[in-house]
Amino acid sequence: YDLFNDKKIGIGYGLKLADFVSIGAQIDLLNNKVSGYESNTAVTFEIGTLFKINKKIQIGAHIYNPARVRYGKNTEERVPTVFRLGATYTTKEKLWVTAELEQDLDNNLAFRAGIDYKINSILTVRSGMLSYPLSGTLGVGINYKSMQFDIIGAYQKITGISPQLGISYEF
């Protein structure tokens, strides 16, 4: 969809509290632009926790934009506040199967599911789906030393294909 552009840049930090629990937080700078209108910017944050039930199962919870910030000073449009609860099942350390419930305060409850297959120590392929709005994703991850690069294409009927890029560094 050529008339809309949405950007997010974040910096986050995660901490392992014990062998079975980790927490994380991220600060995000958001910008969206609709053709013919002003660009809107916002700063928000997100927090999450991950519980390792056993070697194969993990359960996580995440809150995005708990402060309910708005895009800019001159708009009533709020950045979505989203709650997520999910689980991951790992088989043979190469295949992850995930499921997640997502509740945006302004939209319907959504279900996500995905698979992540580690081909080797460098390359991972991923695919997933979201129930609302109905969409699918396909991507690859490249791991090099402490860096991870993710290239993803998401498809949704109204907006078409949305390319996404992620870069992570692990200290």
Which residues does each PLM region occupy?
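Subset of outer-membrane beta-barrel
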Residues: Y1-F171
